[in-house]
Amino acid sequence: DNHINQWLEKTDFKSDKQKILCSIRNQVLQDCMSKGSELPPGIYTLTVPTGGGKTTASLGFALRHAIQSKMKRIIYVIPYTSIIDQNAEVFRSILGEKNVLEHHSGILYDLTEDKAENEAAYRKALATENWDMPVIVTTVVQFFESLYANRSSKCRKLHNMANSVIIFD
């Protein structure tokens, strides 16, 4: 809640049209956060028109639902890397860099890099192998390869998928 409230306070709404749209987005966000606290684990859908604030609303739902259901992480499964880049940037602006892992074919973290030289890159490289971060943003391919692969390197993420809020966008 703190991260989302701070982000809302920093957001500047200039025009009246933006204020109206942002008011609607805020209502969608508040409704999703409320439901995230109330609903038991299950399968849910969120249908909102384009530009209606699904990205932040789904994050609000997921955060509340993870806390209420004592889940360890949130995994976003998205079909296109361009959308992953965009959503991961939004999540980082709200939750901070250290809480969001972006994992797709266009992002490579080097585990051979000197740990002392670049601690953040080394930490992300390790987290990519087993998805050990609070929020993971990944492709459909990465997600299903982790479920169905016959190579241990691909299956290292499997245990961290359990007890997670998983969102298919």
Model regions and ranges:
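N-terminal helicase ATP-binding lobe
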Residues: 1-169
